[in-house]
């Protein structure tokens, strides 16, 4: 069900919500996207919606955009009972002719979602507001990546004509800077979101001692040289995740070699491959057997969040690991 299906819904009374969901049930929708500005700001409507979906839609996945200012612990508790992703717009705000980015608000909302173990995504924009610049966009991206969102979306890279958030050249954001921002955004969309990198991204970034935006800028250049950048027409969501994983590992090896950290790359490769196998099991139901150089118990432990310490303290142990769907969810065993 597309966001366009909500265009005729206004007011969000209990009856209108019931009617909308009844249409979803008749259509046997398995994934429903909720994208409505008025709804996103209406806490009471969001709670009504969540309670109804918990009761009547146990097998449907909902992607629900909620205004950060409306999100609170009560909504998080209600959302925790259904299969969903909460989508948040992290935007610049304006007051008295100045723009600002409310890091305190956004970090608190992300903390609520992480505490409730909810999947959430963040939507970022660039050059759509007076006062924005390439530097402030990169700052927002760096800030967002550190909040552990499941995905970071950039609607402006999905369509050349974005009516909601059109880009425009200003004294602070040149046409060349807009192209750079677009390429960085597309690189993030490919590597982080399509690459399902959230479990390990910050861990592999730490030894490189660079910010996320710098990493994605370098990956954007790697994509350009490989003819899989924005201008090439490459669509990362249409590529099997296993192929994105190969791209990730190829680029990460380049970066680790560049920083003279080749001795750490075996750890990185094992962490990426094991987490990738779990991602494909969850996303595509794909069971597999992979070869690892370390015990999977170690690779999935908190110690793996510090790549350098892991390499120094954990002994290598060749394993054949089966990734499979267990009775209580994704599981693994050493063969």
Residue map of PLM features:
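Weak global preference for isoleucine
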Residues: 17, 26, 34, 52, ...
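Short, exposed beta-strand "edge-strand" segments with a Pro/Gly-rich flavor and a Y/T-containing core
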Residues: 68-70, 167-173, 181, 229-239
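Radical SAM enzyme core and accessory elements
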Residues: 186-335
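Conserved non-cysteine loop/helix-boundary elements of the Radical SAM core domain that shape
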Residues: 5-173
């Amino acid at each position: 069900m597309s966001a366009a299906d909500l265009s005729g819904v206004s007011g969000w009374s209990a009856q209108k919500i019931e009617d909308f969901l009844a249409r979803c049930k008749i259509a046997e929708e398995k994934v429903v996207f909720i994208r409505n500005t008025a709804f996103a700001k209406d806490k009471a409507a969001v709670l009504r919606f969540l309670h109804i979906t918990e009761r009547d839609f146990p097998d449907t996945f909902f992607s629900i955009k909620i205004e950060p200012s409306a999100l609170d612990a009560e909504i998080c508790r209600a959302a925790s009972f259904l299969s969903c992703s909460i989508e948040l717009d992290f935007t610049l705000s304006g007051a008295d002719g100045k723009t600002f980015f409310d890091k305190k608000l956004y970090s608190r909302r992300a903390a609520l979602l992480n505490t409730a173990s909810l999947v959430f995504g963040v939507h970022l924009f660039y050059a759509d507001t007076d006062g924005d610049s390439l530097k402030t966009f990169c700052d927002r991206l760096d800030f967002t990546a550190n909040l552990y969102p499941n995905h970071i979306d950039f609607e402006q890279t999905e369509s050349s004509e974005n009516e909601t958030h059109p880009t425009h050249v200003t004294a602070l954001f040149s046409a060349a800077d807009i192209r750079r921002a677009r390429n960085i955004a597309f690189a993030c969309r490919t590597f982080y979101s399509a690459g399902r990198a959230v479990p390990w991204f910050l861990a592999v970034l730490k030894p490189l001692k660079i910010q996320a935006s710098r990493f994605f800028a370098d990956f954007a250049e790697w994509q350009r040289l490989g003819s899989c950048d924005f201008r090439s027409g490459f669509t990362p969501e249409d590529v099997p995740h296993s192929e994105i994983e190969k791209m990730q590992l190829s680029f990460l090896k380049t970066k680790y070699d560049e920083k003279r950290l080749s001795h750490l790359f075996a750890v990185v490769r094992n962490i990426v491959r094991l987490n990738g196998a779990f991602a494909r099991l969850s996303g595509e139901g794909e069971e597999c057997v992979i070869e690892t150089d370390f015990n999977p118990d170690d690779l999935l432990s908190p110690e793996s969040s510090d790549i350098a310490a892991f390499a120094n303290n954990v002994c290598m142990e060749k394993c054949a690991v089966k990734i499979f769907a267990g009775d209580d969810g994704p599981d693994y065993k050493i063969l």
